[in-house]
From Swiss-Prot:
Stored CDD domains: PIN_YqxD-like (cd18720)
Domain of life: Bacteria
InterPro entries in the cross-refs: UPF0178
Descriptive protein name: UPF0178 protein MXAN_5526
Species name: Myxococcus xanthus (strain DK1622)
Family as reported in the entry's similarity comment: Belongs to the UPF0178 family.
UniProt xrefs under HAMAP family: UPF0178
Amino acid sequence: MKIWVDADACPGPVRDIILRAGQRVKVHTVFVANHALSLPRLAYVSSVQVGAGLDVADRHIAQQAQPGDLAVTQDIPLAALLVPKGVVVLDPRGEVFTEENVAERLSVRNFMQELRESGVTTGGPDGYSAQDRQQFAGALDRELTRLVKTEPK
C-alpha cells in the first residue's frame, strides 16, 4: 500500500497531516508534482518531480496507483480515474470519493467549468479552515486504519 499525494495544489496543513500519518502507520508516501518539493527527510517519504504541463502529475499517479492504495487530490477527473481502480481517494477537506459520488462530482465540475468558460462568474471554494483540517485528519485516519487492517500480510 502507498499514499499518493497530488502535491501541485496540496494545502500545506494537509501535507503535514499526511506526513505524520504516513510515518505513524509506516506507509510509503509519494508526493507527485511538476515542481521541486521541499519535504523533510523521513523514512517512508519520497517525491516524484514530473515534467511541466497540464495534468502530468495526475497521469503519473493514475498510472502508478494500485488497488488498495490511497490518494489525496482535489482534482475530480483524477479521482474519477482512480476510484474504479480500487484506490481510496480523499480530497483535502476529508471527503471520500466513491463509485456512488465521483460521477456526480465530475458532472458538476464540468458544468461549472462550462459556465466559467462562457463568462459566468461562479466564485471559488471557501478558504481552508481549521474544521477542514480536522475533517481531513479524521477521514485520513479512518481510511488508513481500514486499509492497513485489510492489507494482505
